[in-house]
């Protein structure tokens, strides 16, 4: 509050369920996580994926106590994908990009996330920030990020909010 800000769009990525190849348990939604034959591997408190899981469960009216494996925590997308691949869990949540690294799982889309950078106006106008934004907006940089796979770089570097009159 009281601080002039600029929000710069960076990229989007897809989040979804990691399930065993062929989705043998036919997991389609968060509602399925309350089934007694489904076990999830969760992410650590404070992670973006954990926030997503908790919010989706809340929206569905599913108490965390009703989700088998909710207390079983891993610390990365790859650990979650590997747990599903090994059969230690039926489902996990993570980014599409990381699912591509584990051939024994399938990815089921849940939502797209937007990654944005918030910059104070006083910093936005400084030369180092302007140079960083120039790099972010360059086709070379965007091609490199897109080449990593799993990221949508459309509108990268675009100002999506400004309460200070700053222009793209």
PLM regions: where:
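A mid-sequence, solvent-exposed acidic-amphipathic segment
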Residues: 62-88
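Flexible hinge/capping segments at coil-to-helix
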Residues: 19-40
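A ligand-binding cleft/hinge motif common to bilobed small-molecule-binding domains
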Residues: 81-111
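Periplasmic-binding protein-like
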Residues: 14, 102-134, 155-160
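Hydrophobic residues within well-ordered alpha-helices
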Residues: 33, 53, 81-85
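Ligand-binding cleft/hinge of the Venus flytrap
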Residues: 31, 45, 49-72
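N-terminal segment of the mature folded domain
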Residues: 1-23
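Ligand-binding clefts/hinges and TM-proximal coupling segments of bilobed small-molecule sensing domains
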Residues: 43-55, 139-168
């Amino acid at each position: 509050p009281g601080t002039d800000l600029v929000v710069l769009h960076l990229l989007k990525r897809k989040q979804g369920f990691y399930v065993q190849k062929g989705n043998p348990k036919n997991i389609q939604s968060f509602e399925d996580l309350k089934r007694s034959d489904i076990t999830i591997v969760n992410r650590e408190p404070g992670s973006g994926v954990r926030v997503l899981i908790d919010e989706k469960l809340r929206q569905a009216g599913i108490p965390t106590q009703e989700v088998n494996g909710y207390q079983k925590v891993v610390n990365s997308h790859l650990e979650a994908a590997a747990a599903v691949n090994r059969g230690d869990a039926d489902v996990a949540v993570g980014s599409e990009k990381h699912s591509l690294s584990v051939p024994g799982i399938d990815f089921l889309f849940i939502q797209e996330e937007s990654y944005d950078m918030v910059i104070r106006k006083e910093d936005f106008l400084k030369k180092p920030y302007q140079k960083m934004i120039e790099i972010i907006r360059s086709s070379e940089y965007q091609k490199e990020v897109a080449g990593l796979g799993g990221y949508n770089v459309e509108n990268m570097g675009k100002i999506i909010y400004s309460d200070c009159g700053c222009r793209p």
